[in-house]
Structure formats: structure tokens, C-alpha cells
């Protein structure tokens, strides 16, 4: 073989190498996309959940109770944590110790109000993003040490391994809703919410709410609903569809004469005007804080927004570390109650987002309609 032919052959080989690299990248990327979609499955609707605990107590009409709603942000969000899906940088909690510290502190915060009921959201049970910490176990152990509580867990999603960001993939996530009750939870049900379709469902993940039944001494039931509506990959129509499904279940229970309390992270501007209140002059719009559609709330139900100590935001935008008075904040979390539940006090508590990207909401209530005093002129 001549020198000219050898040189020509070498050039041909070098020319093939980048093509092979491109082909391998395409095959790997295609294989990953196929894995994500083929491994995708939704948890079944109307799934019976198994409450745990030894409480045998029934709730009473006319007695004051305290309930807390708290999104724990899967134990990652210290006040300087920024999240990649919110234009921030980080995709995982900084360390296992940081996760444990955040969950311990947020749980202690909830317990500090001596609650009768607590609705937690974003509780991880073995996720890459939270360093495989079993957050449910930490919370349950603390509540067991504080008194006699029943608890029930509803898994929101079990996602495929997300290979993004490339430098530190978000990984696989397994997370859900955890309800705590001093009173006997006789049964609980997981309802699957309508979510995005197509590629968007990978971002939206699965969504659900849990319906827990607690007997009341008058023969009725207290229906506790723990929910976390979609934040990403959604639009107004889908958000309304989720609320309409939720409201249909709430109304069905109210029509039976039961007492209904729904709490959690609604991923809407809960008071409708909190975005402008906390961020005057802002032109920012996000799908997770569109105004709450008050017009679809069914008759017989009320949002609890008469805050005893004024407006306090319940979440921050995590594109940057939290700076009071500068960071974008809004009210997403709260309670909606049936008319046979009297809200005696409600307040969002300013915890400066030190251990989660949400602030807790505390409500005191009684079962039974508020008494009204009529006056007559003589």
C-alpha cells in the first residue's frame, strides 16, 4: 500500500470517529427518553390507605381544636437554597445532615402549636434529592414521642431518574402527604388528580390528595383532606380541573352532613391579591401562583383568610437566597372549610423560610356553626 493510500485511510478513520460519537450520544439520549416514558406509571385512583397509630378518640362538637398545614420542601430548602426548576442552581439538598436538620426543625415547629391535626406536604421516603432520608419515619417518631397520634401517608409520586442538571442530576423522587391526628383515623383514601399529558407529565409528576375519616361523637365524621396541587407543567384549565375534582369530593361529604376541612399547598395565589401585596409593581407571572378561582368554590364552603395578625407569605420563589422584603413571596397555603366548621383563628406564621421554602399555617376551629346573637329594637 502506497503512502498516499495509507494517509487517505487514516483520514477516513478520523472522519468516522465524530460520527460514531454523535450516534452514541443519540442512542443514549433516545434510550433515556424511552426509559423515562416506559417506566412512567400513575398510582391508582381510589387507593385505600392504611392508617397507623393507637388513638381511639372521637372528635367533639363545640370543642376548640388546632390544625397545622406545612409544606416541608422535602427537607432541602434552607433559606439560602435555590432550586434549578425555579431558575436557581441546586437540584439536591446539600447533605444528608442538612435534610435531617430541616425535617427535625420543621416538625418541632408544627409540634410547638400543640396541634390536634397536622397536614404535611412534600415528605420524602427515599429520594435522590433528599439523600435517601426517610423523612416520614423522623416525623412519626417525633409525634409518637409527643403524644398519641394516628398517621396516614399518601404517596404522591415515584418518579423515574431525572438526569438533569447533568452536573448533579435531580435523580429519582418518592414523596407524599403525611397526616397526623390525635383522633382515630378509621380509614383513608388516596385520590389521583388530573395532571398534564405528553412530555409535560414528566415535569408535573403524579399528584393526589388524601381523604381521612375521623368519627365525631354526634355520629357524623370529620373529613380531613391533605392536598398538594400541581406547580409545574400546568395551566389554568388543568388547575381548575384539579380543584373541581377536589371540590366535588368535598361537597359530597358535606351533603352527607359531615364536617370538611381541606388544607395544604394549593399552588394558587390563595388570597387572590397576595402577589401584588407582597410584590408591589411586579410584572412576574408564574403558573404556580395564578389567582385562586373563587368562583368555582361550591356553596357551603369558605376559604379561611381572615388572618388574626395580618398577611404573611407562605412561600418564596427559590431563584435566589431569601432576602426579606426583596424576594418574591406569595400565599399558596391555607384551609377551606365547610360551613358547619367554625374558624376561630387562622394565621400564617413567619419562620423566615429557614428550614423550608414554605411557612406553616395554623388554624383553630370548632365543629359546628358559629352561634349568632340576634338583637331586636324595643
What does each model-identified segment do?
Residues 2, 6-141, 145-146, 153-174:
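N-terminal, active-site-proximal structural segment of metallo-dependent hydrolase catalytic domains
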Residues 66-72, 103-132, 180, 212, ...:
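Active-site beta-strand/loop signature of hydrolases that rely on acidic residues for catalysis
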Residues 141-145, 171-188, 215, 327-342, ...:
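Conserved beta strand-loop-helix elements of the APE1-like EEP
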Residues 233-234, 238-339, 378:
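Metal-dependent phosphoesterases centered on the DNase I-like endonuclease/exonuclease/phosphatase
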Residues 372-378:
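Intrinsically disordered, low-complexity repeat and linker tracts
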